[in-house]
């Protein structure tokens, strides 16, 4: 089955901006995330497809390769990150064609001789954050299996005490000439593999100049990050061969759903249930309702003649974005819990009860209302613990 176009997967045009691509990714990632679709293999596949599309289209080099060559740009074992918690990047797309045409025509690379040691692959680490961690910033310790510099040979790949010798097959050129009829074809030297030198391999890294190790890193996540944001740690990817520089590590952020707040940009949204009695009282007299924020509980003044479903904006109670732009707002929606199937006597008693409370009838036996305030209590207990 052929792969779908990455732009089609995200539902954006080919000239879409990075902001539009990120917005589309966030919407689809939330829709198909495994936490929301447990046991649904179709949703899991779509989530992977959406994530792959986002990673390609937000990387300038990979996007350029895809725009020119389509999926063929990543079918040679390079391009793109692997799955799981982290993954390795492949060879640069330009190098794929450099290898092919360089071998045939004896050019391709500058100098047409010894191969340069390749920079190490980039890695990706997927990090899940709570909303509180994303908003305030946090330091996280992570473990990343990778290839690191070999201390035994100091990255040279040669056995300690030995030195590199000129390859006798290609005489240090890194290439050999093969005659086929009337044609002379230059190919990578099979003895030194294009390096021009022969070494006695290091026992620790087997001549690669690098070895497998799990690194422990302390990653500082800046305040205000959101799902889809990516943090680059320069030089923390795989070490290159034979002393070549290391690649980079990209930390991909995913913010978990919150049981009270929903984030959209730098704004937060919250639904606050109020009892039927309290709603009636506030509609006539106005009043106050307690609202949770990221900084603690605050009282929201509700004017008279307030109807059910009205939205209130609490300025400066949202998120300070990682890219600036000021602090967002908290948008509060009052949801009235209406009792049903009341008899005439019950309605009369309800009215008397409201009057006896002096108009402050915030108490409710509704389970949704109880659940909300229990959730608020847990939220603030977690903040102070």
UniProtKB/Swiss-Prot annotation:
Keywords: Chaperone, Cytoplasm, DNA replication, Metal-binding, Repeat, Stress response, Zinc, Zinc-finger
Zn finger limits (CR-type): 137-214
Amino-acid positions noted as binding Zn(2+) 2 in the UniProt annotation, renumbered to this chain: 167, 170, 189, 192
Highest taxon of source: Bacteria
PROSITE patterns: DNAJ_1 (PS00636), DNAJ_2 (PS50076), ZF_CR (PS51188)
CDD domains: DnaJ, DnaJ_C, DnaJ_zf
Pfam families: DnaJ, DnaJ_C, DnaJ_CXXCXGXG
Sequence ranges of the CXXCXGXG motif repeats: 150-157, 167-174, 189-196, 202-209
Localization of this protein: Cytoplasm
Every J domain range: 5-70
Any one biological process term the GO annotation gives: DNA replication
Record family assignment: Belongs to the DnaJ family.
Entry function: Participates actively in the response to hyperosmotic and heat shock by preventing the aggregation of stress-denatured proteins and by disaggregating proteins, also in an autonomous, DnaK-independent fashion. Unfolded proteins bind initially to DnaJ; upon interaction with the DnaJ-bound protein, DnaK hydrolyzes its bound ATP, resulting in the formation of a stable complex. GrpE releases ADP from DnaK; ATP binding to DnaK triggers the release of the substrate protein, thus completing the reaction cycle.
Record's comment describing the protein's domains: The J domain is necessary and sufficient to stimulate DnaK ATPase activity. Zinc center 1 plays an important role in the autonomous, DnaK-independent chaperone activity of DnaJ. Zinc center 2 is essential for interaction with DnaK and for DnaJ activity.
Protein name: Chaperone protein DnaJ
Organism: Vibrio harveyi (Beneckea harveyi)
Gene: dnaJ
